[in-house]
């Protein structure tokens, strides 16, 4: 079966549980039509570059699937009809990348927040202030 990756954005006023419920719902739609979800990720609420339906932010979700095209078309149709889903993007891939997506890796790096040892900045001089 072909491999697909899906990203969808849902409205910002949904709770995290409702957004994750949408992921579960669309995973079930794929399973009911003969496909399977290989991996799913909830990326959280992110600010968008421009407003969509008067929303500046949205809940982002990412699915990796192994499904026939009919199952993907049905899932996309239901996503576009769903009032809470603002945007959908589906791409066909040759193979799924191993491990977490780039977005999740960025989030893990941000959560660590470790800046390490900062070396003493010797170029400032001992006075600290402006040099003339």
UniProtKB/Swiss-Prot annotation:
Keywords: Ribonucleoprotein, Ribosomal protein, RNA-binding, rRNA-binding
Lineage: superkingdom: Bacteria
GO biological process, one term: translation
NCBIfam families found in the cross-reference section: S6
GO molecular function, one term: structural constituent of ribosome
HAMAP family for the chain: Ribosomal_bS6
Disulfide feature: none
Bias (Basic and acidic residues): 105-132
Membership in a protein family: Belongs to the bacterial ribosomal protein bS6 family.
Region entry Disordered, spans: 96-132
Native source organism of the sequence: Cereibacter sphaeroides (strain ATCC 17025 / ATH 2.4.3)
Gene Ontology cellular component annotations, sorted alphabetically: cytosolic small ribosomal subunit
Function description: Binds together with bS18 to 16S ribosomal RNA.
Ranges in coiled-coil conformation: none
One Pfam family this sequence matches: Ribosomal_S6
Name the UniProt record assigns to this protein: Small ribosomal subunit protein bS6
């Amino acid at each position: 079966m072909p491999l697909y990756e899906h990203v969808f954005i849902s409205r910002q006023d949904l709770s995290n549980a409702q957004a994750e419920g949408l992921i579960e719902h669309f995973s079930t739609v794929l399973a009911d039509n003969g496909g399977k979800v290989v991996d799913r990720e909830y990326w959280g609420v992110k600010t968008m570059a421009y407003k969509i339906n008067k929303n500046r932010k949205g809940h982002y979700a990412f699915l990796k699937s192994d499904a026939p095209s009919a199952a993907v078309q049905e899932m996309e149709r239901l996503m576009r009809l769903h009032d809470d889903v603002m945007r959908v993007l589906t791409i066909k891939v040759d193979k799924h990348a191993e491990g977490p997506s780039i977005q999740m890796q960025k989030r893990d790096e941000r959560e660590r927040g470790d800046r390490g040892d900062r070396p003493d900045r010797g170029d400032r001089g001992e006075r600290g202030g402006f040099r003339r």
